[in-house]
Amino acid sequence: MLSNRHFDFHALRSSASRPVRWLLWSTLLMICPLAGKAQSQPQIDTNPTGYALLYTGPISDPDSNEAIAAVVKQAGLPVVYLDNLDDLPARLAGARLFIIGGTEDDVEPLVHRFTPAITGALKRYLSQGGRYLGICGGAFVASLGWADEGNYVKALGLVPAESDDYDGDFSPKIHDIRWLGEVRRMYYQAGPTFALQPGTEPVRELAYFDDGRIAALMSAYGRGKVAVSGPHPEAPASWKAETQDGDTMDTNIPLAVQLVQELLSDRPVLTPR
């Protein structure tokens, strides 16, 4: 009787455990493929959108700010406006891109607003993977510096290039710009050209004036990237009426959107120095 009871109990335990084991194996079979898929997925960006931080404080140009903001929104980023440069270090934490666009004719006072602490915060942000876009006055700010009436104005040095006026005239014009191999009629007003200096970071020359001088370029900065342009690819059609000669102007906004998207991308700056 004891043996029979033991046998019966063992049989009962075995038969009762079959569905439990089957359920366990079925669950494992379902979980394992999911685990494999999870491991094969790319890592999710913890800050997938961020924002573009656009400087709108003293010396900046409101029309340029408005045009750049429209371009950045087309490129898929929300825009946050920064009117006090002292707040820059704190605002960079959530920014994917920092922008300085067109400015007043005298951009040197803006350079002087960058204290060592502000400049250091911006350079750390870039070296850790941040982005900077400078157009016209903002491109001067990002350069190594420029000569001005016998003096040399030292700028931030975000790109390995010195800057200089293209034509020494502050009146708005339409110039032929060879942008990525295609000649475009583009708005220009006292923006810089660039002369590359010896450096270790890769640089890609994006555009040229008709005399062959560099009009726009992109450079690596540590893990980050910097793009600068003397002419204004973001200019809307309404700006044409302001130009000195009233020449025709191409619609270049798609080029500006493409520039922002390329700057934001993870693709490296491919042309080595």
Language-model segments: residues:
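N-terminal secretory signal peptides that target proteins for export/translocation
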Residues: 1-17
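Bacterial N-terminal signal peptides
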Residues: 22-33
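Boundary at the C-terminal end of the N-terminal hydrophobic targeting segment
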Residues: 38-40
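Mature N-terminal, pre-catalytic/accessory segment of carbohydrate-active enzymes
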Residues: 42-55, 61, 67-72
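Extracellular ligand-binding/catalytic regions of CAZymes and related secreted enzymes
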Residues: 44-46, 123, 231-273
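Helical hinge/lid and interdomain linker segments adjacent to catalytic or ligand-binding clefts
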Residues: 62-147
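Class I SAM-dependent methyltransferase SAM-binding "motif I" and its flanking Rossmann-like core
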Residues: 143-185
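Catalytic beta-strand/loop cores that center a nucleophilic Ser/Cys/Thr
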Residues: 168-239
